C-alpha cells in the first residue's frame, strides 16, 4: 500500500540541521537545551464530546474548565514562531474544535510561520471553521472508528447520529477545499479493534466514494501505561481474524485515494524489547506538548509526570519554560534514568527514536555505502 503522506514513517531526515545539532551536542545538556522543538502538539481545551473506549488520556479527566485563553495562545505562538517551531497539531486531551476562538488561533499560527494540522473527531466541524481555517491548514486527520452508526457509537461512546454528522461535515470540507483549490489534505484514521475490524472495508468505501477524502489510515491500538481503560490491553495483532481485510483494503486505492494499513507498526507492537532503542533521544528535544491547562511537557505519553513537566505558559513565556531549569533536569532524566521499556509501545516519536538511536549508536550496517 502507498504511504504517500509518510504516515507510517518519520520525516526527521528532512531536517538535517536539527539532527546535526543533536549529534554534535553529544549529550551535553547545555547545548541540547538550546534546541527548540520542530513539532508541538497543542490541546486547546480539556473537554471532549466523546469518550472513546481506546482513549489514551482518559486519566487526565476531560476537565471542561481547562482551556488555553486565546490571548495567551497568541503570545505563545509569536514566541514559538520566532524560535523556529515549524509545526503544530491541534489535538490533545480534548476535542480542539470545541475551542470558541480556534479560527483566530489557526490564523495566528499560520501568520507567524508555523504549519497547522488537526486531529479531531469532526463532530464540531462547522461552516465557520471550514470557510476560515481550511485555507491555513496543512492537513486534517479525523478519528472515525466504525463503519456503521452502531459500531461508531459503541467505540466513541456517543449517539449514533454523530456518525452521519461526521460524514456530512467531511463532505462539506472536501467540497469547499476542492471548489476553492486549497492545499489541505483531508484524511480519516481508525484504530483497528475487535468491534470494527469487519467494517474497515465498508468504512474505506464510504471515505473514498461518499466523502472523497485523500486517505484512510488503519492503525493498531497502543496501551498508554497511565490510562484507566484496559479494554484492549491484551489485543494481539498477529491474529488473522483482526487483519483478514488487509488485501481488500489495499484494493480500494486509486490515484486520488490512498490506504495506509500500518502493518509494520502492528508488528512492532509485539516486537522483542531487545531490538528496541534503549534511549529516547527525541525527548525533550524535537517535540513538545502543551496541555489545555497551560503546562508544557516534553512527551505526550508522560502527562502529569513531573519529570516531563517544565513549566506553565500562564506563568512564564514559552521560551522561559523551554530553556528553564526544569527542562534541563528533564533532559538529564531522559538521558540517564528513563527506562524506555516501560514507555508506551509505538509512541508518537517511536520511528524518530529508532532513527536517532541507530545514528547515535552506530547501528546502521555499511552506512557509508550511500
Q: What are the language-model segments listed below?
A:
Residues 1-14, 43, 63-64, 68, ...:
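Radical SAM enzyme [4Fe-4S]-AdoMet core and its adjacent flexible, acidic
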Residues 62-119, 123-136:
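Conserved Radical SAM active-site core
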Residues 48, 52-55, 88, 105, ...:
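Hydrophobic packing within well-folded, soluble alpha/beta domains
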Residues 48, 94, 122, 190-192:
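Short, flexible loop/turn elements at secondary-structure junctions
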Residues 59, 92, 144, 220, ...:
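Residues that line or immediately flank small-molecule/substrate-binding pockets and catalytic motifs
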Residues 51, 93, 120, 292-293:
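Residue-level recognition of short loop/turn positions
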Residues 51, 84-85, 136, 211-212, ...:
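Short loop/turn motifs at secondary-structure junctions
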Residues 1-64, 81, 266-275, 285-287, ...:
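N-terminal pre-core extensions flanking Radical SAM catalytic domains
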